[in-house]
Amino acid sequence: MNGIKVMDMRCNKGDSAFLIDDGITAILYDTGFGFTGFEVAKNIQAVLGERKLDYIFLTHSHYDHALGSAYILRYYPTVKVVAGSYAAGIFQREGAKRTMREMDAKFAEKCGVNDYQFLGDELKVDIPVNEGDVIQAGDMCFEIIDLPGHTRCSIGFICKEKGLLLSSETLGVYDGEKRIVPSYLVSYSDAVSSIEKVKKLDIKRILAPHYGILNEEQTKYFLDNMKSASENAAHKILKSLKDGKSSDEIISDFKAEFWHGYIKEIYPEDAIDLNTSIMIELIRKELM
């Protein structure tokens, strides 16, 4: 992509960790789980060789995106971690780290990993950022855009010169084809506002969480359909609530629509059950 390579560093399909490299400066976009962190670091080493990893860009504070950074720091102690100011505060909370530990260990066990060191206390943010801040990463320049909705701390990174957006789950989780899974966990209205903000930008390519770099056709499809995907899901949930359906029934309907193919590979069932239950309560609160 015009001098920039984007490479998949994941070692588990549920991970989200992608390397952006222009041959001079290397950036890791999200870092994946804690229990896979060392393996992700080894994948990076296999690509960079003796070169250093310059930056870690974190889109939000969830364990499957951010926890791996603590492990990667063991391999690359000079790397600069960039995350939203809100996320930087979350990393200081003992309760948040305890939740990360529990969720990471639970999924690790499902993947056959039962014994590994938890490094949550080593989470850090070197460069806390807010809307409009600019990160000059060598010759690559990224502007920060706040994208709340999935979490309060969700952000995106825009390289305007390349028309490249490093996206957030607030916009939806994409399977690369025709399915965009809504994922608003703190605010439906904020998610829609974030989507509308992105639609106004000149975006040619998207690096999508849990998927990777989209080609131009995929990018256009995603930009054209991300809003309707979130709105349609909200309206279906609202109708189900008004029809008297239980949360379990609504979750089952949601999974019947979205939990297939690639999405099923990257989205554990207990996670989609939990997240959909949260979305149901958001819709109940915001739209009823």
What are these regions (language model features)?
Residues 37-38, 45-130, 134:
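Active-site HxH/HxHxD metal-binding segment of metal-dependent hydrolases
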Residues 25, 76-79, 203:
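A short helix->loop->beta-strand "cap" motif at the edges of active sites that frequently abuts
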